[in-house]
From Swiss-Prot:
Compartment list: Cytoplasm
Enzyme Commission numbers on file: 5.3.1.1
Similarity remark: Belongs to the triosephosphate isomerase family.
Assembly with partners or alone: Homodimer.
GO molecular-function terms, A-Z: triose-phosphate isomerase activity
Descriptive protein name: Triosephosphate isomerase
Active site: H96 (electrophile), E169 (proton acceptor)
Key words of the record: Cytoplasm, Gluconeogenesis, Glycolysis, Isomerase
Primary residence: cytoplasm
UniProt binding sites for substrate: N9, W10, K11, G175, S215, G236, G237
Function: Involved in the gluconeogenesis. Catalyzes stereospecifically the conversion of dihydroxyacetone phosphate (DHAP) to D-glyceraldehyde-3-phosphate (G3P).
Any GO CC annotation of this UniProt entry: cytosol
Pathway assignment: Carbohydrate biosynthesis; gluconeogenesis; Carbohydrate degradation; glycolysis; D-glyceraldehyde 3-phosphate from glycerone phosphate: step 1/1
Length: 254
């Protein structure tokens, strides 16, 4: 049985001191959570140093929001895998729609980042995929999402796939207050799992974690997580306050 992976993505919020404070509340709040739920928080790069002091030795995994596919060199403003590992980073989010939109990350670049990350001892790499509103309205959702998966996972072996988490985030639902219905989300998640079966194997498809992201909150998370092919959530705004994030965690962990 697959575990539930609940990841908070704090985006460009909080100073390092503020982030450490929220992290401490979350760490304290999930000490007795059952083993079937994995808790993850993803602060800004500038907060990793202080937050890692809070998460170290706890049952909360620490993540980064992006990284370079190069390990060093003339890459002004970028962060390398080795730099992230120095701060105890357990996982990295790659291919988030905001990075695709504002930073110009293409499927090819994201694939390079995935392959680079697999050469380092991260526990997980989260590959984000999702369609825009116009793509959904033109019935291109599955074409877009499955192509992003094929390109993002190019040259990834089945053994390495065990360290990959997929996160379906419809772009039109991120930060808008809109969310896919549980039926809409399940339809896409099922198609993703079948695509993994086609690319790899039935066992790989059965094992891979597929999160949902897009205005997840305490009111809709129960229905979403009740679907067969949804294995957790990548949570934005509702993860910024410890209380709201812990409410989601506790609802899923029941």
């Amino acid at each position: 049985m697959r575990k539930m992976f609940l990841a908070g993505n704090w985006k460009m919020h909080y100073t390092s001191v503020e982030a450490a404070g929220v992290a401490k509340q979350i760490v304290d709040g999930v000490q007795n959570i059952n083993d079937d739920v994995v808790i993850m928080i993803t602060p800004a790069f500038t907060s990793l140093c202080k937050v890692c002091e809070v998460t170290k030795g706890s049952n909360v995994l620490l993540g980064a929001q992006n990284m370079s596919y190069e390990n060093s060199g003339a890459r002004t403003s970028e962060i390398s895998p080795s730099m992230l590992l120095e701060f105890g980073v357990d996982y990295v989010i790659l291919g988030h729609s905001e990075c695709r939109t504002y930073l110009g990350d293409t499927d090819e670049v994201i694939n390079k980042k995935i392959l680079a990350g697999l050469k380092h001892p991260f526990k997980y790499l989260i590959l984000c995929i999702g369609e825009t509103l116009s793509e959904r309205e033109n019935n291109k959702t599955l074409d877009v999402v499955l192509n992003q998966i094929r390109r993002g996972l190019m040259s990834v072996s089945e053994s390495d796939l065990k360290r990959i988490i997929l996160a379906y985030e419809p772009v039109w639902a991120i930060g808008t207050g809109k969310t896919a219905t549980k039926e809409e989300a399940q339809e896409v998640h099922r198609a993703i799992r079948l695509e993994i079966e086609s690319l790899y194997s039935t066992s790989a498809a059965d094992d891979i974690i597929i999160q949902y992201g897009g205005s997840v909150n305490v009111d809709n998370v129960g229905g979403l997580m009740g679907e067969n092919d949804i294995d957790g959530a990548l949570i934005g705004g509702a993860s910024l306050k410890a209380d709201s994030f812990l409410n989601i965690v506790n609802k899923v962990a029941k």
